[in-house]
Amino acid sequence: MKVAAAPISWGVSEAAGWGYRMAPARVLAEMRQLGFDATELGPPGYLPQDAAARRELLQRHGLRLVAGFLAAVLHDPAFPAATRVTDEAKLLASSGAEVLVLAAAFSGGSYDAGRRLDAGEWKRLARTVREAEDIASGSGLTLAFHPHAGTAVATAEDVRMFLDATHVALCLDTGHIFLGGAEPATIVRTAADRVGHVHLKDVRTAVAARVRSGDVSYTEAVRQGLYASLGQGDLDIEGVYDRLRKAGYQGWFVLEQDTALTVEPAPQEGPAAAARQSLEYFGRIVGVK
């Protein structure tokens, strides 16, 4: 079973003004202490940019790099998406990663001010994503497109349009898919062959409803506990896993619980304790299959 952690579960995000950022050495050490042996990259500059230094840091903590997340403007030709994808692909390939996870950001670096694209912007986005897939493939990587709150592909309708407009693999993030109004299990049932990477998140639906209604921003909802440890929220994580298994999914399961910190947590508390719960829950559902 291919299971990985991600720095976002320790509050490390690329979003502007997200919160307090823990040092890489502590985050990687806690991942390994919990039993993870793989991780995603984290935001630009979080791990060393130098390939040798990055590999040494990961090896020192007994971890391998499996994927990296890039949020780039894909619908506007004024932004050099191809350059950013090329740079990210080279960085990931030099570290032995397998997947480049791409989201369709808006300029500004926030996930709190999304909007719908017009027809011309949609065509540009689809074309740019197809170009990004070619770039990733040229570096030996799989491109997995990530629907995400506050981006150009966020809602259930956006996801449907994306699946119709491209043949690119999907990063199935159970939290963001649900937040956008779709059921993750339904995506697996109708488009299992498109799932190339998985971010497993659990969601507190009462908080999600406040995001959908506009009562709170996405960032504030994360601070209020939008995401729970796996098995502690309201999503049918076991059902999603079961559908993926029956569909023959062979990729990575990245256990995520996006969080935003204000201070350094006590050792093995906060994010580490939450990640431990998720890993134990995932072990239980995998063990009975």
Walk through the language-model features, giving the residues of each.
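Conserved, mostly hydrophobic/aromatic
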Residues: A5, M31, T39, L58, ...
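Surface-exposed, active-site-proximal loop segments in enzymatic domains
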Residues: Q49, L70-D87, F106-E121, S213-G214, ...
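Active-site beta-loop-alpha junctions enriched in small/polar residues
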Residues: I8-G11, G42-P44, L70-H75, A105-S107, ...
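Non-cysteine beta-strand/loop elements that form the S-adenosyl-L-methionine
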Residues: K2-P7, V66, E98-A105, D193-A206, ...
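Acidic (Asp/Glu)-rich catalytic clusters
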Residues: L28-Q33, L47-A67, T83-E98, R130-G138, ...
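Acidic/histidine-rich catalytic cores of soluble enzymes
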Residues: A5, A38-T39, R127-D234
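Active-site mouth loops of central-metabolism enzymes
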Residues: S9-A23, A72-A82, G114-W122, S229-Q232
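Active-site acidic/histidine proton-transfer and metal-coordination neighborhood
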Residues: R60, P77-C171, L179, A272-A274
